[in-house]
Structure formats: C-alpha cells, structure tokens
Amino acid sequence: LIKQTLTKYRNQLIMQQQRTFYNNILPLNTEEHKDLRLKIDNNFSIFSNTNALPIAGVEFIEASREHAIAFINYQDEGVIPVYILGLRDNENLLLDDNNNWKYRYVPAFVRRYPYIMVEPDKDGKSVVCIDADYEGINDPKGELIFTQKDGETKPTPQLEAAMDMLKDFNAQLTRTREFTKRLEEYDLLKEISPQINLADGREFSIGGIYTIDEEKLLKLEDEKALTLYRSGEMAWIYNHLASISNLIRLAEHLPADAKGTPKKTKAVKKKKVAKKVA
C-alpha cells in the first residue's frame, strides 16, 4: 500500500500562494510596455508538477462535474479548498502529452497565467503583472496588450479581459476565505483518508485532506443552515461532497508503472480501471 499523504500538497500550495509559478514578475505600465506583444497558448507545462491548486467556491459547480475538490489545512493560511490534480507528489494527471488541459473545465488559477494581480501598492491599488519569462512574450505573432487611443496608451480588449478576470478571481478568493472560516466556526470539517483500489491490485491511500461532515451538516442549527443556504454556500458544499467520488477518475489516468502494492488475490484480467473508492 502506498500512503500518499498530502504534506507536499500543503507545501506546494504555500509556494503557489507566494507566486512561484511566476519566475520573473513584471509590473505592467503604459510607458515601458506600450509595444509589448503577447501570444497566449494552451501549453500549461508550468503546472505539470503540481498535484493540487487553490480553487474558488464559485468554481465548485463546474469543477465538481469532472474532478475532486477537497480542503486542506496549513498553519499560516488556515483551511482552503483545492482542486486535486494527481494522487502522487509532483503529479498532474489532467495534462496530456502536449501539456494541454485534458478536460473541459480549466481552473481560474490556471487560466489567469501569465497574468497575476498582486497586493495593493502604496496608493492602495492592485498592480497587474505578468511573468516576464513566459514564452509568448514579444512573440511577433502575438497581440499588443496596449493601444493608442486619443493620444493615450490604454489596455487592449485582451488585457482588459485579463484584468477583469483577475479582479473577479481575487474577489472570489476573498469570498471563499469567508466560506472556509464559516466551515471552521460551524465545526463542519472532518479529515478523511480515501483509499483507491485499482482492478490490477494496486492501492493508493490519500491522507491529510478534509471534507464536509454531512452528519454534522444535517444537525446544524436552523439559523446557521439558513445562512449557508442564502449565501449560496450550501450549493458549494454539496458540489464538493459529490466531487469526492471523482478521485476514481484520476486513478484511471495513473500510468501503468505507478507503483502500488498488489493484493494477494489473483489478478483481474479485465481492463485496468479503478473499481472503487473506500
């Protein structure tokens, strides 16, 4: 049995919160970057060694249809929801051989790259930045991110759309933090260690993740339940709960050489697919 604890999930997420995906963060301004071109592609190789990413509550309904959403807890940040990408350390099973996203829904954390909005400056304004090491920067086939209009340098529609997305994502992350604080206040989280059994006898167990305790949820005081309902967070909760069974979908994409401990029972000769999550 391979015990895949999520200790490294936590470490990776702390690093991600510190923007380590962005190797060279460059604040954008109209003076220096008025001629900058950017070509956006669907190569997400920068996320290939990542097994979980932060996700906003508003994304739960779309993300839960395809893959698992869980919660993790680490000392400085508290509880946050994560989109599980792999069952082993440094593994993203949602990318194909060309580092394109395999599935319909791409998390906002991924979609925003190479842009990022950093903390407010001394004037209280958030600053839009870009990863200066992104391969698509200054590509001749790329689009200008600024344009001249009425004698002024202004964002192009491409950059405006990115800025709107960043503002919305940051706002949703703030709302999600309020949601997770409420879960902790209501004592609705419990730690789980789901076990995934493959038909060929390999087993994988995940530790260090949290889910909503449905038994406690059903016993919640009416006033608290109404707060969750009217805020829309009750829908988030049930989307999360439904998503946990999607760990099987991840297991079906494990490479054939992913090591596990075979069961002592005879091997199943059928197609090697995941058969259950205990």
What are these regions (language model features)?
Residues 117-278:
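A contiguous, surface-oriented mixed alpha/beta subdomain in the mid-to-C-terminal portion of proteins
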Residues 76-77, 99, 201:
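Detector for glycine-centered tight turns/loop "hinges" at secondary-structure junctions
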Residues 62, 109, 187-190:
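Short solvent-exposed loop/turn micro-motifs enriched in small/polar/acidic residues
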Residues 1-18:
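N-terminal amphipathic/basic-hydrophobic helices that include classical n-h-c signal peptides
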Residues 80-148:
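Aromatic- and glycine-enriched beta-alpha-beta binding-site module
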Residues 45-49, 88-99, 172-180:
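Short, basic/low-complexity N-terminal boundary segments at the transition from targeting/disordered tails
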